[in-house]
Structures are given as C-alpha cells and as structure tokens.
UniProtKB/Swiss-Prot annotation:
Its main location: membrane. This is ATP synthase subunit delta. Pfam families: OSCP. It comes from Bradyrhizobium sp. (strain ORS 278). InterPro entries: ATP_synth_OSCP/delta_N_sf, ATPase_OSCP/d_CS, ATPase_OSCP/dsu. One of its GO terms (molecular function) is proton-transporting ATP synthase activity, rotational mechanism. Keywords: ATP synthesis, Cell inner membrane, Cell membrane, CF(1), Hydrogen ion transport, Ion transport, Membrane, Transport. It is a peripheral membrane protein. The keyword Disulfide bond does not apply. It is found in: Cell inner membrane. SUPFAM superfamilies: N-terminal domain of the delta subunit of the F1F0-ATP synthase.
Length: 186
C-alpha cells in the first residue's frame, strides 16, 4: 500500500504502514488516528515538546521519560502510544510528524477519502467550509477532509492543495500576477 502513495515513503512511511496495518487488524483505526491527532496538536502547541522531539541532544531515555509523562497527561494509550515509544527507543522521534501525516494519508485512502490542505487569510466559517467540502467532493468524487491553516500573508482568498493539484485564488497571487504583467508592459 505504501508504494502506491508518494506521501507514504521512506522511514516514516514504513512506520506509518506498520501502524496502519496493526490498527486496521485491531479495528482501532479511528482511535489511533484520534490519539495521533491529539499528539500532533500538542506538538504544534508546545515549543518544549517540539524541542524534545527534534533535538538530538536529548538521549533516548530522557525522551522516553518525557514522552511517557506527556502521553499519560494527554490520555494517549494503546497502539498510538506504543508506536510513539518505539519511535523514541529507535531514535526516530524526530520523524513523528511525517509518520502521522503518512498514517493519515493511509487512513484517508482506506476510507475512500481525500485530504485537502486549505490556506486562508482569516478563519473561515463552518458554512463556507461545508460549501468548500461539497465543491471538492463534486470534483473528486470522494469525501474530502480539510486541513485548514490561517496565513494572513495571503491577504485574502484561499489556496487549496489536493493531491498533486493546487488552486491558488489568493489575493497575494493575483497582486503578484498584476505586478509581473505591469513590469512586462512597462
């Protein structure tokens, strides 16, 4: 399965594939995904946790003790906790974000879903999110999960990445196009 999806490759892909197959066999795909998403959110929120995960300065024992404390406090257990411990023991914790991303890609494929990365200038309403999901479902023929990121630098509009396709209707891109057209004309 991993060879079919370019986002599921390398070391991260192997861990994600093994994790997915184990979760599928135990019929706990949704629970594992929820736990990994919870850990990913903690990683995004905590600079200290990011440093622990990324820095080679911390030994495996130190990382494992800290990770166990985080997992206990967050209520992450079972298969998801075990794979995080294995990553730590094998000195691969730095790849956890890629493992989670690859696992989510495998889950989406398993469920017949597609995942789109959406960048907006300001938070988008639920009504508009639902309309965007419906439009993307019409195009892809699949249910579409959205990963929404707010980036004020795009000024307005949105950027949608779905697989190898990208739709950029941001105001920043339109202004850059006008700027280039004016440079060529003048």
């Amino acid at each position: 399965m991993a060879a079919e999806d370019p986002s599921v490759s390398g070391v991260s892909g192997r861990y994600a594939t093994a994790l997915f197959e184990l979760a599928r066999d135990e019929k706990s795909v949704d629970a594992v995904k929820a736990d990994l998403d919870k850990f990913n959110a903690l990683l995004d929120e905590s600079a200290d946790l990011k440093r622990l995960v990324r820095s080679p300065v911390f030994g495996a024992d130190t990382q494992l003790k800290a990770l166990n404390a985080v997992l206990d406090k967050a209520g992450i257990a079972g298969v998801a906790a075990n794979v995080l411990r294995v990553l730590t023991t094998n000195r691969r914790l730095f790849a956890v974000a890629d493992v989670i991303r690859a696992f989510n890609a495998l889950v989406a494929k398993y469920k017949g879903e597609a995942t789109a990365d959406v960048t907006v200038a300001e938070p988008i309403s639920d009504k508009n999110l639902d309309a965007l999901k419906a439009a993307l479902k019409t195009v892809t023929g699949k249910d579409v999960a959205l990963n929404v990121k707010v980036d004020p630098a795009i000024i307005g509009g949105l950027v949608v990445k779905l697989g190898s396709r990208m739709i950029d209707s941001s105001l920043r891109t339109k202004l850059n196009s006008i700027k280039h057209a004016m440079k060529e004309a003048g």
